[in-house]
Regions:
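Conserved N-terminal/central alpha/beta ligand/cofactor-binding core
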Residues: 21-125, 140, 152-169, 176, ...
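An anion/pyrophosphate-binding glycine-rich loop and adjacent beta-alpha core
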Residues: 36-38, 54, 182-320, 417-502, ...
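Conserved beta-strand-loop-beta-strand element in the redox core of flavoprotein oxidoreductases
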Residues: 127-143
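A glycine-rich dinucleotide-binding beta-alpha-beta segment and adjacent secondary-structure elements
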Residues: 306-372, 399-413, 539-593, 598
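Extended, charge-enriched "interface" segments that sit outside catalytic cores
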Residues: 430, 447-617, 621-624
Length: 625
């Protein structure tokens, strides 16, 4: 047993698992400390991964060599590609996972990684040498030393749960809170605040009248999360089910409002705007006669179901009586009630873009303690923190992703530049370059970067090269192959698209909405031969990638030009160059605090709330630009 490591990761949630795995895979001797080894990567809320923008983050984690995508594919019990009625920039994969298998799979990966060790305990104190962290001390009194420490404590820092007027200290139901760390960090000058989140009841499926609900099956196509050449849909695929609340349900919920922690002053913290509790819905949207609910399976072999859309901290009796007003739940039996939880987080503007704290060297934060919400947002931060914790030990430039490179880059830049005043959730609307950040090409954007870092392995890099060669061959064929009207017009008319008046290149036909690579290949035998050269195991994935590039090439080029222009400002470094208080020509907002985070670049300064274009022009003039 050793007590000295390169990297220590505190907390084995989604951020901690990715951080520990990344550091270990890059060669750092890594210790992962968790309160409970049986709760590694626990899905504390819904048993699902992905969704709008979140699915893109999981694809990026996978492209960089993380594990969330692989674990999700291995444990999926339902998969859907959301937003397929829109353009591919908006397509987002989402999967229901078997909660128990998800934990088991993650634990199996971590326990078998070289360089990674696990210790079950609670960290209560950081070991410091001046303003540099050098290790941790646990509740058992054990001291571990390291060159980098990553905190990924989730909702456990001084966690306080609420069920009606009942309050329970803990980080999750039936799990203790972590104390001491927040108090120590605040004493060292790090600003801490409180946030709130919540979760719904868990239902015994044997008590549900499924014939009173609408079935929502998954999809059985080639889509998955991981770019690795692995099988998916290996577990039994299960349906979700939908129903609605009603006025009788709402009447019971309103009865409980005097005892609601959200409305009686018990909870003062801000919760996630885009995941409101059921009591918030009936108050905020009082005119709505019903709200949709989704009953989601927790696993392949369990009767436990998660009621998405019914997050609540109302008293137990109110939750039960309200649900009993819904026909499908008239005989409801639950495993545990919904509850709200308040917890400490740290203002993320106190971080550099590599997620190291500005006040304490060698200390990194990732996940919910940075004010985010969601497994995917946590995993993305954890991966970046783990990479940079390793670099901090062994040397090298910080690993930072740009806003035009990844949703993870958008996420981290938003956190450290703008801060948060509510739990931060990723949306496609937060990204300026959505067409560049599609879910189909995260490997093209990120895998080579990760390979050169030493995180993505050779097999992943070989798959990337194979995909690129096959994709580019399809595009090249389409660019060079000539089409004559007499050979194709009858087929075009059958597809419902205008016949050709004169010859053209195949690539000129493909952007038509009625045309796909597969259906045009039926009309052009030589093109069918070209498509058949694609490796069978990845054929649909690669053909889809080629089709998206062809159909949207103009939009992609235009967005890349805009991104390149903005990137020039990313290369103008200003950190430490100005005393902003002394520049009288700056706006009052800029001088009195908005620039207090001391931005790294002009581009980052331009994204700070309250900073005007004229402020940026003044700084450029002072730089002689």
């Amino acid at each position: 047993m050793t007590f000295n490591y390169d990297v220590i990761v505190v907390g084995a949630g989604h951020a901690g698992c990715e951080a520990a795995a990344a550091a270990a895979n890059m060669g750092s001797k890594t210790l992962l400390i968790t309160m409970d080894m049986n709760k590694i990567a626990q899905m504390s809320c819904n048993p699902a991964v992905g969704g709008i923008a979140k699915g893109q983050i999981v694809r990026e984690i996978d492209a960089l060599g993380g594990y969330m995508g692989i674990v999700t594919d291995r444990t999926a019990i339902q998969f859907r590609m959301l937003n397929q009625s829109k353009g591919p920039a908006m397509w987002s994969p989402r999967s229901q996972s078997d909660r128990a298998r998800f934990i088991e799979c993650w634990r199996g990966i971590l326990e078998n990684l070289p360089n990674l060790y696990i210790w079950q305990d609670t960290v209560r104190e950081l070991l410091l040498d001046g303003n540099t962290v050098c290790g941790v001390k646990t509740d058992m009194g054990v001291e571990f030393h390291a060159k980098s420490v990553v905190l990924t404590n989730g909702t456990f820092l001084n966690g306080l749960m609420h069920i009606g007027r009942t309050q329970i200290r803990g980080g999750r139901i039936a799990e203790p809170a972590a104390t001491g760390l927040t108090e120590q960090l605040v004493s060292l000058g790090i600003k801490s605040e409180r946030m709130k989140t919540g979760t719904p009841v868990r239902i015994d499926a044997r008590s549900v009248h499924f014939d009173e609900m609408a079935e929502q099956p998954g999809e059985n196509d080639f889509h998955k999360f991981s770019y690795m050449d692995t099988s998916h849909r290996v577990l039994k695929q299960l349906s979700c089910w939908t129903t609605f609340t009603n006025e009788a349900c709402h009447a019971v919920l309103r009865e409980g409002l005097p005892d609601s922690p959200l409305y009686n002053g018990q909870i003062q913290s801000i919760g996630p705007r885009y995941c409101p509790s059921i009591e918030t819905k009936i108050v905020t949207f009082a005119d709505k006669p019903q709200h949709q609910l989704f009953l989601e399976p927790e696993g392949e072999t369990t009767q436990e179901y998660y009621l998405n859309g019914f997050s609540s901290s109302l008293p137990l009796d109110i939750q039960l009586r309200a649900l009993q007003q819904i026909p499908a739940f008239r005989d409801i039996q639950i495993y545990r009630p919904g509850y709200a939880i308040e917890y400490d987080f740290f203002d993320p503007t106190q971080l550099h873009h590599n997620l190291e704290t500005k006040q304490i060297r060698n200390l990194f934060f990732a996940g919910q303690i940075n004010g985010t919400t969601g497994y995917e947002e946590a995993g993305g931060q954890g991966l970046v923190a783990g990479i940079n914790a390793h670099i901090n030990c062994h040397g090298g430039d910080p690993f930072v992703l740009g806003r035009d490179e990844a949703y993870i880059g958008v996420l981290i830049d938003d956190l450290v530049t703008k801060g948060v005043d509510e739990p931060y959730r990723m949306f496609t609307s937060r990204a300026e370059y959505r067409i560049l950040l599609r879910q189909d090409d995260a490997d093209m954007r990120l895998t080579e970067k990760s390979y050169h870092l030493g995180l993505a392995k050779q097999d992943r890099y070989d798959l990337l090269k194979e995909k690129k060669v096959s994709r580019d061959a399809i595009i090249s064929f389409a660019e060079n192959y000539s089409i004559k009207p007499q050979y194709i017009n009858s087929g075009l008319e059958a597809l419902g698209t205008t016949p050709l008046a004169h010859g053209c290149k195949l690539i000129e036909l493909i952007p038509r909405p009625q045309i796909t690579l597969e259906n045009i290949a039926e009309l052009v035998p030589a093109f069918r031969t070209e498509l058949d050269k694609v490796p069978v195991s990845r054929k649909e994935e690669i053909i889809e990638a080629a089709e998206i590039l062809i159909k949207y090439s103009g939009y992609i080029r235009r967005e890349q030009i805009i991104a390149d222009k903005i990137n020039r400002l990313e290369n103008i470094h200003i950190k430490g160059k100005f005393d902003y208080n002394a520049i009288q020509s700056l706006s009052t907002e800029a001088r009195q605090g908005d620039l207090g985070i001391d931005p790294d670049t002009i581009a980052q300064a331009s994204r700070i709330p309250g900073i005007s274009p004229s402020d940026i022009n003044i700084l450029l003039v002072m730089l002689g630009r």
